[in-house]
Design a protein with these regions (language model features):
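HotDog/MaoC-like acyl-thioester-processing domains
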Residues: 88, 99-157
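Hydrophobic residues on conserved beta-strands that form the core of alpha/beta folds
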Residues: 9-10, 77, 107, 121
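Hydrophobic beta-strand-centered segment that forms part of the acyl-chain substrate-binding groove
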Residues: 57-95, 119-129
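Compact, glycine-rich, soluble single-domain proteins
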Residues: 39-46, 50-59, 74
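Conserved positions in beta-strands of structured domains
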Residues: 10-13, 78, 83, 97-99, ...
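Short aromatic-glycine motifs in intrinsically disordered, low-complexity regions
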Residues: 1-3, 67
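Hydrophobic core residues within well-ordered beta-strands of beta-rich domains
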Residues: 6-8, 92, 106
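Catalytic strand-loop segment that frames the active site of acyl-thioester-processing enzymes
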Residues: 4-45
Length: 157
């Protein structure tokens, strides 16, 4: 994880063959500039960044479902619950399950655990739109390689 630049997923662990669920991992770094202010002497991963990690996990699943044809953008966070603190050095397991897709929106149930214990969960809604002009798709494809996303399985040649 590099939370200061919003790189929250370190590895795509598994995508189910039906493209309904995904499992990713993210290791909270021992050192990060975000901990200077959150909180001095008691570093905690900000809850909004945990939600971002769950959103990015869902984003990889949505990209797989549409074969990288369109980009998911987080639109709504519903029913977010933060259950405990996350400290530097913890390895997070991030899960997402698609609940509904239609009319350019995707709804997913997401959760984050550490060593099997619940950390947080939320229902997230995404707007799925054509890629913006410019290099964004190329950048996302490079990040996909870094996080071990099986690009060859989900991108048309």
């Amino acid at each position: 994880m590099r939370p200061e630049v919003f790189k929250m997923v370190d590895r795509v662990v598994a995508i189910d063959p039906g493209l309904e669920t995904i499992h990713c991992e993210g290791l909270v770094p021992e050192e990060s500039s975000i901990f200077e202010g959150h909180f001095p002497g008691h570093p905690l991963m900000p809850g909004v960044l945990l939600i971002e990690a769950m959103a990015q996990t869902t984003g990889w699943l949505v990209l797989a479902r549409n074969r990288f044809d369109k980009m998911p953008f987080l639109a709504t966070v519903k029913e977010a619950k933060l259950r405990t603190f996350v400290v530097p050095g913890q390895n997070l397991d991030l899960y997402s399950k698609i609940l509904h897709e239609g009319s350019g929106f995707v709804v997913a149930q997401t959760r984050c655990t550490c060593e099997g214990k619940p950390i947080c969960n939320a229902e997230l809604v995404f707007r799925v739109l054509p890629w913006p002009e410019g290099r964004m798709k190329d950048v996302v494809l490079k990040v996909a390689e870094r996080v071990e996303f099986p690009v060859a399985d989900y991108v048309d040649a």
